Amino acid sequence: MEKYLIVGLGNPGSNYAKTRHNAGFMVINEICNKLNLFLDNSKFNGMFAKTIYNNCVVFFCQPTTYMNLSGEFVSKMLKFYDIPIKNLIVIYDDVDTKLGVIKLRKKGSSGGQNGIKNIINLLKTEEIKRIRVGIGKDPHAKLDQYVLSNFKIDELVIIKPAIIKGALAALEAIGEDFDKVMNKFN
């Protein structure tokens, strides 16, 4: 059976749970709610749920390191469970994408996002499938303060459908041609 590692990026702790930077965690939580899974397994500074989905063994994960160290968890999980990089999908927030929009890519640079940057550096490849959740940006705020701020109430109405759509895209990508999934969701 093929194995997949689906990783949502964010920062651990309840004080970060509703921040923009935790959009990746929010997508993983949405998937787990949809599939009635619990992130109750712990390994390599991360939490994960393991299940069979679309005839594949799938690990839905949230690193418990801070965002900029996410690659340590990802590289150890890939190696330990013998998961090929082609079956890695990383989900994270993107300030360069409009609030509420998701974008799927098969490869590319980090775009300045420190979590995916660390993963790219440790895996030594930019050929990593990803789902970027648009959080937009505030031209009047410092970037670090903005990404670590909670979504405003009126923004939650916009981001929630994107979280659901990101979860559906991740699930559809398991065992399927990623180009086909990109065409559907982009």
Swiss-Prot record:
Record site: Discriminates between blocked and unblocked aminoacyl-tRNA: 11
Location of this chain's protein in the cell: Cytoplasm
Keywords associated with the record: Cytoplasm, Hydrolase, RNA-binding, tRNA-binding
The UniProt record lists the keyword Hydrolase: yes
A GO molecular function held by the record: tRNA binding
Active-site residues, record numbering mapped to chain: 21 (proton acceptor)
InterPro entries linked to this entry: Pept_tRNA_hydro, Pept_tRNA_hydro_CS, Pept_tRNA_hydro_sf
Cytoplasm listed as a keyword: yes
One Pfam family named in its UniProt record: Pept_tRNA_hydro
SUPFAM superfamilies cross-referenced by the UniProt entry: Peptidyl-tRNA hydrolase-like
GO biological process: protein quality control for misfolded or incompletely synthesized proteins; rescue of stalled ribosome
Catalytic function, reaction form: an N-acyl-L-alpha-aminoacyl-tRNA + H2O = an N-acyl-L-amino acid + a tRNA + H(+)
Site features described as Stabilizes the basic form of H active site to accept a proton, chain residue numbers: 93
GO cellular component, one term: cytoplasm
Residues at which tRNA binds: 16, 66, 68, 114
EC number: 3.1.1.29
Function: Hydrolyzes ribosome-free peptidyl-tRNAs (with 1 or more amino acids incorporated), which drop off the ribosome during protein synthesis, or as a result of ribosome stalling. Catalyzes the release of premature peptidyl moieties from peptidyl-tRNA molecules trapped in stalled 50S ribosomal subunits, and thus maintains levels of free tRNAs and 50S ribosomes.
Binding partners and assembly: Monomer.
Family designation: Belongs to the PTH family.
Record NCBIfam families: pth
UniProt-recorded name of the protein: Peptidyl-tRNA hydrolase
Organism in which the protein naturally occurs: Ureaplasma urealyticum serovar 10 (strain ATCC 33699 / Western)
